[in-house]
């Protein structure tokens, strides 16, 4: 069993900095933020007959197992994520990884 988990958060564009700050306050060592697009069902959101693709931020955080639940709890408690369907965060075991680069 791995001693680490990869926490993945998918939230509305602009929320990633708040999420990352909350995660660091809860014990994360940092994270990676990437731009992403949602895949809402076609026709669900339209503007003048064109489908609108929701802009998202995706956050990746590698954390020790003991820190995963406190980090997820801190993310869930953010006021910007209180509305149902705002985003999702989950953790998966991180297996077979290595740190890249030479030690200084």
Spans of model-derived segments:
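Positively charged, small/polar-rich N-terminal and surface patches that mediate targeting and assembly
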Residues: 1-104
